[in-house]
Every structure is written in structure tokens, then in C-alpha cells.
């Protein structure tokens, strides 16, 4: 089966993102296809390159990045939600006159069209 995941919770502070990550790993282990993860609302904090968890905590931001690198899972973050929360790529940082960007490599600023496409092309869309 082909899946897409929607994450609406931040990397830390709620269970949503870590549950979504564990679900993503289980899908891959069981032989399903995970085509994309769409980060919306507070979920965009999962793409913040400046997140620095305690040394005894799992680094969820880098975990998502590894999922992208190892399995080719698209990591799309809602551009509108990201900009409102201070998550920008180099292009947006330049456009807004900001000194730097903080979008973790492997993540892509996307519109809701990416979520709509996933809804149309996947067998299941699961929201966390």
C-alpha cells in the first residue's frame, strides 16, 4: 500500500511527531511505500535546523532527515505555516531580507498542493 503522513505537532512537546516517525518506520519495515510526509501547523517545527535536543533524547529532526536520505521520502512543509513560525529556506530568507535560513536539508517548502497530490495518489493518508 502507498501511504502519506500529515504531521501537525512539533518535534518536541507533544507525541504527534514522534508517533508519526515511528509509524513511518513501521510502514517501511512492513514493505509499504511511504511517498511523503506533509508537515502542517506546528508540525513545521520538525524542519527547524536549529533544534537542539538534550544529549539523551532522540533527535527527531535529524531522524526525519535520515528517512528522506535513506528511503527517498519527500518531506514537505507548508510554506505559509513555516513562514509564520520563522522557518525559512535560503530563497525565502533572501526575499524577506533575513540574515540566514534555518530549514533542515531534506525538507522542502511546499504549498497545500503537495498535500492534495498525496491525497489523490496514495491509498491512505494518516494524520498525527
UniProtKB/Swiss-Prot annotation:
Entry EC no(s): 2.8.1.-
Entry keywords, A to Z: Cytoplasm, Transferase, tRNA processing
GO biological process: tRNA wobble position uridine thiolation
Active site: 78 (cysteine persulfide intermediate)
Xref: InterPro entries: DsrEFH-like, Sulphur_relay_DsrE/F-like, Sulphur_relay_TusD/DsrE
Keyword set includes Nucleotide-binding: no
Major place of residence: cytoplasm
Subcellular location: Cytoplasm
GO cellular component terms attached to this protein's record: sulfurtransferase complex
PANTHER family attached to this UniProt entry: PROTEIN YCHN, SULFURTRANSFERASE TUSD
Task of the protein: Part of a sulfur-relay system required for 2-thiolation of 5-methylaminomethyl-2-thiouridine (mnm(5)s(2)U) at tRNA wobble positions. Accepts sulfur from TusA and transfers it in turn to TusE.
Quaternary structure annotation from Swiss-Prot or TrEMBL: Heterohexamer, formed by a dimer of trimers. The hexameric TusBCD complex contains 2 copies each of TusB, TusC and TusD. The TusBCD complex interacts with TusE.
Entry similarity comment: Belongs to the DsrE/TusD family.
Record-linked NCBIfam families: PRK00207.1 (NF001237), sulf_tusD_dsrE (TIGR03012)
Protein known as: Sulfurtransferase TusD
Amino acid at each position: 500500500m502507498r501511504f502519506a503522513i500529515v504531521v501537525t505537532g512539533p518535534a518536541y512537546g507533544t507525541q504527534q511527531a514522534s508517533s508519526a516517525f515511528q509509524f513511518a518506520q513501521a510502514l517501511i519495515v512492513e514493505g509499504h511505500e511511504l511517498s511523503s510526509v506533509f508537515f502542517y501547523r506546528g508540525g513545521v517545527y520538525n524542519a527547524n535546523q536549529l533544534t537542539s535536543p538534550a544529549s539523551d533524547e532522540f533527535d527527531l529532526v535529524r531522524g526525519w532527515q535520515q528517512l528522506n536520505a535513506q528511503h527517498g521520502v519527500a518531506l514537505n512543509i507548508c510554506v505559509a505555516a513555516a513562514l509564520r513560525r520563522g522557518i525559512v529556506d535560503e530563497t525565502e530568507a533572501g526575499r524577506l531580507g533575513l540574515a540566514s535560513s534555518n530549514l533542515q536539508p531534506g525538507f522542502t517548502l511546499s504549498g497545500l498542493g503537495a498535500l492534495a497530490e498525496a491525497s489523490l495518489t496514495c491509498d491512505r493518508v494518516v494524520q498525527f
